[in-house]
Structure formats: C-alpha cells, structure tokens
Amino acid sequence: MSEYSLFTSESVSEGHPDKIADQISDAVLDAIIAEDKYARVACETLVKTGVAIIAGEVSTSAWVDLEDIVRNVILDIGYNSSDVGFDGATCGVMNIIGKQSVDIAQGVDRSKPEDQGAGDQGLMFGYASNETDVLMPAPITFSHQLVQRQAEARKSGLLPWLRPDAKSQVTCRYENGKVVGVDAIVLSTQHNPDVSYKDLREGVMELIVKHVIPAHLLHKDTQFHINPTGNFIIGGPVGDCGLTGRKIIVDTYGGMARHGGGAFSGKDPSKVDRSAAYAGRYVAKNIVAAGLAERCEIQVSYAIGVAQPMSISLNTFGTGKLSDDKIIKLVRDNFDLRPYAITTMLDLLHPMYQATAAYGHFGRTPVEMTIGDDTFTAFTWEKTDRADALRAAAGL
C-alpha cells in the first residue's frame, strides 16, 4: 500500500547500457564463485562505443577467462553487430582488476566464520507490501514486466524490429492504499530504422502493454507514451555510457522504499551492500506474508569488520497487527543478521547473480538452477518460509 495518490516507477531492459554493465559485473562474479565460492569480488564495468572496461578488486585462487565472459554477456543480450551499435565479438575489452586490499581483508576474515565482519560500513533497507502477489509495489512490478516482455518479443521474433535497449515507466493511482488504476505508461524501445512509427506503436501497444497491464486498471484517461520522441534507433552503449551500479532504484523498489545507496552487482556476499539488502527484503516479505503488517520497511546498519548490526529499525506505517517495537523483537529472535549468518540463511555462495542483474532483484520467483556440478536455488530471499513461525511467535 502507499500513502500517495499517484506514484511512478521506472525500469530498463537488459540492453540498457547501465544494465549491460551490471550483467557483466555479475557474470564475472558468478564465474569466480563457481570456481572459488569463498572468493572476495568487487567488479565494476564501463561500456561505451566499441569498448568494455572491467575494474575492481578480487581475492581468489580461481582463474577465469574474463574477456570471454564479457563478450558472451554482450552477445547474449543481443548486441551482435555494428548495425545495432555494439558488437560483443569485436569490441575492445580492457581488464584492470587488481587484488583486494589487505586492510579490508583483515577486517572481514575471521578464524571462526560466524564472526566474519561486515565488508564495509553502511545502511541497507528491505521492503514489502501486500499490494501485489509478489509483495512488491505495483509501479515497479509493472515497469519490470513491460521491459521483460519487450525482451521476450524481441528475442522470440514476435516483434523482430525491436532492438535491445528499452525503458519503461508506470504511474499508478492509489485510493486508501490500494492500486485502483494506471494513469500513465511510458515505453521507449530501440528499433530498426525500417519500421514505421504506426507499426511500432501498434505492435508495442497490443503485444507488450496490453499483454502486461491488467485491463481493469486501464481507463479512458490513461496516457500512453510509446517512443514519445519518435525515433529510437541509436541506443545501447553508442547512445549512452553504461556503468555498474547506476540503476539502484530500478534494482530495488522503484522509489517506494528508501535506499542506503550501495549498489549490488559485482559484489560477493561478504559485501553487506548486497547481502544485507537481500536479508532485509527476506525479513520484510516474511513479516507481510505472516500478516503482521500490510507494509513493512526495515533498516539494518553495519560497521566494517564488525559482525553484529549496529542497528535494526522497522516501520509498518500504521499497518502492523503489533507495535513496531514488538515486531523488531520478533526479527531479532528469528533472524540472525550477521554477515556470515545471512550468507548461510540465504545460501548465497553460488553463481546465481547474473540472473539478478536485470528486471529487479526483488519480486522474483525462487528458481532451481544448475551451473556445472552445482545445483542451488536462486532468489532465496523471496521465500516466505518463516512466515508461519513469525505468525506463531506473534500469537496470531
């Protein structure tokens, strides 16, 4: 639910330059974790016309073919020809990854794993609300679904003139905290030069927008802005430079919840920017799934080298069945939010991260994956397997 009468969120496709960078960073992380699950990885990526640069710090015994990883990500997204503005097969790849600082390592590593310190200071937020089936805000959920559908229509050949870069934006109308309508939809998609605007608009409206947005939420005054500038032929890294970590609101809750500022992609689970944000989502989602509140935002903070959180705060915005203080006690009693405990609780030491790097880290479906000999569940932070225990502990 929302205290707003109107709320807008945006998303971007896997072919957006910043998302290319995120996916490359997480593909590097996955490749290293697949060989050395205790590796320390911080990988940043920059993509621009004809070049991809990876930089950062890594501590690992593994060897991976970084250039091959970078090229495969770009090609899999669909940038496979100079005709679309970028070609993963021929672009330059520059690697300037170095070793992790020993000063950071001594603050994180411990002889007893459960005493592992946080990889940095910082504050992280988790959020959930009951306004959608996936316990996410509706505007960001619809925005993700639009660009996901754009990619499906492009890759399947349903709309063969689509190109990889795309952005979406959805404005939802709320009454008494519930979504009652969609007032505006913006969808900008890169396309081939030979498609007419009439055909593009018709195809996008019928096969993307109407496929995603529930008909009962559309009304006579809903505004549809499909490629509002007219042409969107030049896109991807030619049109804009892409950087890891530039879409942190797209990655999370579309602005409906607060954000601590730390990006996710390219970071192994010892970095609480990522793992504690996942844990925050897990806690908040289980609170809402348990019926303890209709809406919940949790904040956790850490100090570098210290295992225990500095603080745990929580707000149910007046929707809680219990006081926020009592729910915080339930959180402390049922969730261990030390870094190592989070990694264990959510089973994070697997090569699952490239799958998170487009279309949002939250509101996804837990899915079993097999990479090499490793079979695991991705998106474990979306499980509601502690809801019953929370409900029982609350006496509901």
Curated annotation (Swiss-Prot):
Binding residues annotated for Mg(2+), in chain numbering: D18
Signal sequence, renumbered to the chain: none
Domain of life: Bacteria
Broad class of where this protein is predominantly found: cytoplasm
InterPro entries noted in UniProt: ADOMET_SYNTHASE_CS (IPR022631), S-AdoMet_synt_C (IPR022630), S-AdoMet_synt_central (IPR022629), S-AdoMet_synt_N (IPR022628), S-AdoMet_synthetase (IPR002133), S-AdoMet_synthetase_sfam (IPR022636)
EC number: 2.5.1.6
Annotated residues for binding of L-methionine: E57, Q100, D240, K271
Disulfide bonds: none
Cellular component per GO, a single term: cytoplasm
Reactions catalysed according to its record: L-methionine + ATP + H2O = S-adenosyl-L-methionine + phosphate + diphosphate
The keyword ATP-binding is assigned to this record: yes
Listed CDD domains: S-AdoMet_synt
Localization: Cytoplasm
Gene Ontology molecular-function annotations: ATP binding; magnesium ion binding; methionine adenosyltransferase activity
Binding site for ATP: H16, D165, A166, K167, D240, R246, K247, A263, K267
Cofactor(s) the record lists: Mg(2+); K(+)
Keywords: ATP-binding, Cytoplasm, Magnesium, Metal-binding, Nucleotide-binding, One-carbon metabolism, Potassium, Transferase
HAMAP family according to UniProt: S_AdoMet_synth1
Similarity comment: family membership: Belongs to the AdoMet synthase family.
Function, as annotated: Catalyzes the formation of S-adenosylmethionine (AdoMet) from methionine and ATP. The overall synthetic reaction is composed of two sequential steps, AdoMet formation and the subsequent tripolyphosphate hydrolysis which occurs prior to release of AdoMet from the enzyme.
Protein's UniProt name: S-adenosylmethionine synthase
Organism: Pseudomonas savastanoi pv. phaseolicola (strain 1448A / Race 6) (Pseudomonas syringae pv. phaseolicola (strain 1448A / Race 6))
